[in-house]
A protein has these predicted regions:
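Positively charged n-region of N-terminal signal peptides that target proteins for export
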Residues: 1-5
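C-terminal motif of bacterial Sec signal peptides marking the signal peptidase cleavage site
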Residues: 16-19
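Bilobed "Venus flytrap"/periplasmic-binding protein-like clamshell domains
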Residues: 23-51, 55-56, 111-178, 288, ...
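Extracytoplasmic small-molecule ligand-binding "clamshell" domains
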Residues: 36-72, 78, 235-236
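An extracytoplasmic/periplasmic, membrane-proximal ligand-sensing/linker region
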Residues: 40, 167, 171-173, 177-178, ...
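Acidic, polar ligand-binding/catalytic clefts
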Residues: 73-110, 121
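Pocket-lining segment of extracytoplasmic ligand-binding domains
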Residues: 83-85, 93-95, 122, 159-248
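Ligand-binding clefts/hinges and TM-proximal coupling segments of bilobed small-molecule sensing domains
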Residues: 133-150, 221-293
Length: 312
């Protein structure tokens, strides 16, 4: 009888400890380990863990679409997402067949570049040249998958016109290095580690001209963007492409005080983030062209610093 009692007490203690650990852990939804969401999520977790009474844990995911589903279903608490994908998820439009809500914005962080990599000696010089080629369009539930489909369509192509693969950045870069892939799409801050690691062997394809104009007009969220020369080894010229804003979001169930503290720590430590290296990150950038309401905790911080944002 005593043995059974001890086992029960031990089991209850473990359950209580596990529950406490879960309750006091904030899950951060990021992306591929060789993408910028994961890198910046790791930086964010390190800063917050040094300035908080809870533990912030980085979670690898497929990317924006997955993060929006996960935060809506309460599997993660804060997440990095593309603004264009976020807007579609929030409103149940685009590639989303229903609304995914339960989250609000903390801050717009930086502009991600839509990058299309091909082998350096390839005869592919335009998106139009991808017809019949093996192309990674991005992982399922990633933001890049939505971008790649839209861009192919703008050039008169679709998934059935290419040998479509759905790989992570890491796996796509590995496949290209091994000669098993003709091209891959990557939407991420630059430089992106997955591309940096093979930069001597690849070139980037531009998205420019009338097609870029049409895409920015058709889809709210795209902006014209330049990948500056020498961003990657061997890249001697600017590459004109499109960009989308990265937004950090928080679950609506997270307390106002917690989100206010997160927001404050981001701005107090902005010099420690890789995404702030080009000096474009400030309160104006963080709050402009964010297409969903802000969390009340973030709003409180902005208001105290003279910036008003919508919360509903």
């Amino acid at each position: 009888m005593k043995k059974v009692l001890y086992i029960l007490i031990a089991a209850i203690s473990i359950m209580a400890f596990s529950g406490c650990g879960m309750k006091n852990t904030v899950q951060i939804g990021t992306g591929d380990v060789n993408g910028t969401y994961y890198a910046y999520g790791t930086e964010l977790a390190e800063i917050l863990n040094n300035n908080s009474d809870v533990y912030f844990k980085v979670r690898k995911t497929a990317g924006s679409a997955a993060n929006l589903r996960l935060i809506s279903q309460e599997y993660v608490d804060i997440a990095f997402v593309q603004s264009d994908v976020m807007k579609d998820a929030y409103n149940g439009t685009g590639y989303f067949d229903k609304e995914y809500k339960g989250y609000s914005a903390i801050a717009g962080l930086y502009t991600e570049a839509i990058q299309v990599a091909v082998p350096k000696d390839s005869d592919i010089n335009s998106i139009s040249d991808l017809y019949g080629k093996s192309v990674s369009l991005g992982e399922k539930e990633s933001g890049v998958l939505q971008n790649s489909k839209q861009i192919l369509s703008a050039y008169g192509l679709n998934e059935s016109m290419v040998d479509a693969k759905y790989l992570s950045y890491t796996d796509a870069a590995k496949a290209m290095k091994n000669g098993n892939l003709d091209a891959f799409f990557c939407t991420a801050g630059t430089p992106t580690r997955a591309i940096t690691e093979i930069s001597d062997d690849i070139k980037l394809i531009p998205i420019d001209g009338t097609v870029a104009n049409r895409l920015t007009e058709q889809y709210n969220g795209y902006v014209k963007h330049t990948i500056k020369a020498n961003t990657y080894d061997g890249q001697t010229e600017d590459i004109e492409t499109l960009g989308v804003k990265t937004v950090l979001i928080a679950s609506d169930k997270m307390s106002d005080d917690r989100v206010k503290s997160i927001t404050k720590n981001i701005f107090d430590n902005s010099n420690k983030f890789g995404f702030a290296k080009d000096d474009t990150f400030d309160m104006n950038f963080a709050t402009e062209n964010v297409t969903i309401p802000f969390h009340k905790g973030a709003s409180e911080y902005y208001a105290e610093n003279g910036v008003n944002v919508e919360t509903e």
